[in-house]
A protein has these predicted regions:
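Metal-dependent catalytic cores of enzymes that make or break cyclic nucleotides
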Residues: 73-79
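Mid-sequence acidic-hydrophobic segments that form the walls
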Residues: 42, 70, 88-96, 109-116
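Acidic/histidine metal-binding catalytic segments
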Residues: 49-57, 96-113, 123
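Divalent metal-dependent phosphate-bond-processing catalytic cores, especially two-metal-ion Mg2+/Mn2+ enzymes
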Residues: 25-52, 64, 115-222
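Short alpha-helical scaffolding segments that buttress acidic/His motifs in well-ordered protein cores
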Residues: 11, 15-16, 58-64, 106-114, ...
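An active-site-proximal "capping" alpha-helix that borders the catalytic cofactor pocket
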Residues: 35-39, 79-96
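Acidic/His-rich, divalent-metal-binding segments that scaffold phosphate/diphosphate chemistry
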Residues: 1-71
Length: 222
């Protein structure tokens, strides 16, 4: 199989959707679908550039990568949300007869989406790149995602943040991700200058910060 679309399992997706909370404005099932759409382009580019990729690993990883996000992972015995999602993936994939080696690769790829994780294999890089693809989306989508993540964060911590405070936090987080180059296709790495991905992320972030500096608390989140 040479594309994500060729291997999508809509019956499985309907089951996995139940592991996502529709109440979350960002980490809902649509986010998983969006990352799979991004992976379609990423893996196609890999093939164009002679980079071999296991599409099934990428597909399963992205399908499950934020499953159970609304649950209290620590109370369930998992150090991170990614570890819980990976466990849910392993259980379900084993139930439907997916081989052990594929499951191990899926678990590793899901764990590689953690902020501080390393990403070494092509599949891990593709999954992390797809998960972060929204950073390089159009500015309207990027800004909407930023606002939705603010809502989620406030719900989780039980406190409200001003928009400038949130933008400051987002700036630090995104710059951290920005510092970690995803050495995959030419879209993500350019030996002769800034890659198209990094340029798009930088421009989105600079505009977000500039707007926040200009308008402060009065900025509209919708």
């Amino acid at each position: 199989m040479n594309s994500i679309s060729e291997i999508r399992n809509f019956d499985l997706e309907a089951e996995v959707e139940r592991l996502y909370s529709a109440d979350l404005p960002y980490h809902n099932f649509q986010h998983a679908i969006d990352t799979m759409d991004a992976a379609e382009h990423i893996t196609a580019r890999c093939l164009e550039e002679g980079i071999r990729v296991e599409h099934r690993v990428v597909y399963y990883s992205l399908l499950f990568h934020d499953a159970g996000f609304s649950e209290e992972n620590l109370a369930l015995g998992f150090e991170t949300k990614e570890a819980y999602s990976a466990d849910l993936a392993a259980d379900k994939l084993q139930q439907i007869g997916v081989g052990r080696k594929i499951i191990e690769k899926v678990v590793a790829a899901i764990l590689s989406t953690h902020k501080d994780a390393s990403f070494v294999t092509v599949e891990q890089k593709a999954v992390r790149a797809a998960d972060l693809s929204g950073l390089a989306a159009t500015y309207d989508i990027f800004r909407e995602n930023t606002a939705n993540l603010k809502i989620e964060h406030e719900d989780f911590i039980g406190e409200s943040l001003t928009w400038p405070e949130w933008v400051s936090n987002a700036n630090k987080t995104i710059r951290f991700y920005f510092s970690q180059e995803i050495r995959l296709t030419s879209y993500f790495v350019n030996e002769h200058g800034e890659s198209a991905f990094r340029q798009a992320v930088r421009e989105n972030l600079e505009r977000l910060v500039a707007e926040s500096d200009e308008t402060g608390d009065s900025i509209s989140l919708r």
